[in-house]
Amino acid sequence: MEKLTILLLVAAVLMSTQALIQSDGEKRQQAKINFLSXRKSTAESWWEGECKGWSVYCSWDWECCSGECTRYYCELW
């Protein structure tokens, strides 16, 4: 009887551990989906004024939609 009780206790601990791990994995997957769906296309970023288009004055690469600031002007992809 004692062995059966211990066996049931171990089984309960293993099942609850598995449930915790599975729940954490689902949360990570959902966070990944949310992150990827929140990204905007280059056209959307340009339209909303979050980046500069081609041949516009710039100082840094990150200012341009193309990501290329050459000689103070945004490059065309």
Swiss-Prot record:
Chief location bin: secreted
Keyword terms: Cleavage on pair of basic residues, Disulfide bond, Knottin, Neurotoxin, Secreted, Signal, Toxin
Top-rank taxon, per record: Eukaryota
Signal peptide extent: 1-19
The keyword Nucleotidyltransferase is annotated on this UniProt entry: no
Pfam families given in the database record: Conotoxin (PF02950)
GO MF annotation: an example: toxin activity
Tissues of expression: Expressed by the venom duct.
Disulphides: C51-C65, C58-C69, C64-C74
One Gene Ontology cellular component: extracellular region
Propeptide: 20-38
Keyword match Signal: yes
Record localization: Secreted
The family this protein is said to belong to: Belongs to the conotoxin O2 superfamily.
UniProt remark on domains: The presence of a 'disulfide through disulfide knot' structurally defines this protein as a knottin.
Name assigned to this protein: Conotoxin Bt6.6
Organism in which the protein naturally occurs: Conus betulinus
